[in-house]
Amino acid sequence: MDLRSRTDDALDMELHAGFDAPEIARAVLTEKTLTGLISSISPLVNRLRDSILIFSDEGLIIHCSLETEQLYIPIPANMFDQYNWTGPRMVVLAATEGRSSLIDAFRHTKDPSTPTRLYFKFTGQPPERSIIQTMVWQRPGDCGPDDQVQCYKQVVKRELACYTMMFPNLTPDISICLKRDQFTRLQRLLKTFGFTTCFILTATDMYIQTAGGGFISFNVSLDINGSKPTPYNLIRSITNSKRILNNVVYGSGSMREFGVLLETHSGFRSAVQNLKLTRDETCYINFYLALTNSPMVGLYIQRSAPVHSFFYATFLSPKDLKEKLTSMQLFANTESVKDEPPLKKRRNLLTKRNEKNTGNKMGGKLPETTWQEGIGIREYCVAPPVDPAGTLDYSELSRESDVICTVK
């Protein structure tokens, strides 16, 4: 529909024509805010099409299940360009019986159909309220390159009258911060190995181990009870301080030696593999240890639309903890690993060896080894490197919809 001559008020009246029920609440996202949310949520859209949307006076929460685990994406009310809410919490299924979903508005596309504005209008009284989502975008017109035509699409859904949901609100006992490069190491580990995931923390180190013998380790500089972080001893590492500093992670909480084993590896693996960090974003691995019978590991991505996920775990027995810790520390301190030449020298040696074997001094391909760039001294993998983590595509699932109205 051509909306080139419409003002905002006229556009608003036309968009909601045909829905005569009085408006009880409204939420609006304009292009600037919506662009940041799309970049954060778009990699997870395939997993969120069948999610649940929860609106309240605090804002919007997108909730879905990832494998057997729970994932939450909160969008607070102050992030919306306009947010007016009255009444109790409202829960809506995002999926419809067709191909449309309320989450489609947060999908990034290469064509001009990426939305520039997003409206949510709420009508009715609980427990029979309705939500009208209006997505507005621009497409090229027929009168030249400067001609832009505004189009819109509407989806109408009714709220769920009966539901049960879990919203963890515990404060983590220990929180460890990973930068993008450190998070990439975790993604690589989980793509290479599988079946189980184990976290072990000591006073100075954190180990993440998977079945098959693969593990990564970080030196922990901890902020205890709000004080300044305890600096990691770098005296012995002055000759290679940059590499060591890249292996230091910062955290907060009351550090103690413990180990936890995730109950389901696939859910944690899927969550990590579906997340991509920019240079300005960080990942927090949170440990909830207050409940001794059911500890949890949390994953928190700090971004425009932060991502929270929680995974149940079990404590390792003192015997298993000691055995795993001893084996990893022994392997980390072996002279064979320490005596490995630096990365640049290793690559030069591989190149010369390849030239000697192939007789090709120009354009010789490096053999696939575990010591290629990105796999260093404190990252032990026994399989060839893999491609960077990507988004897993899953088939779409549909659910029954109350009403769907699409206008173009």
Curated annotation (Swiss-Prot):
UniProt keyword list: DNA replication, DNA-binding, Host nucleus
Origin superkingdom: Viruses
Gene3D superfamilies, alphabetized: 3.70.10.10
Main location: host cell
Gene Ontology, cellular component aspect: host cell nucleus
Disulphide-bonded residues: none
Description of how the protein assembles with itself and partners: Interacts with the DNA polymerase catalytic subunit. Interacts with the origin-binding protein.
Function: Plays an essential role in viral DNA replication by acting as the polymerase accessory subunit. Associates with the viral polymerase to increase its processivity and forms high-affinity direct interactions with DNA. Facilitates the origin-binding protein loading onto DNA thus increasing its ability to assemble into a functional complex capable of unwinding duplex DNA.
Name of the protein in question: DNA polymerase processivity factor
Organism: Varicella-zoster virus (strain Oka vaccine) (HHV-3)
Lineage: Viruses, Duplodnaviria, Heunggongvirae, Peploviricota, Herviviricetes
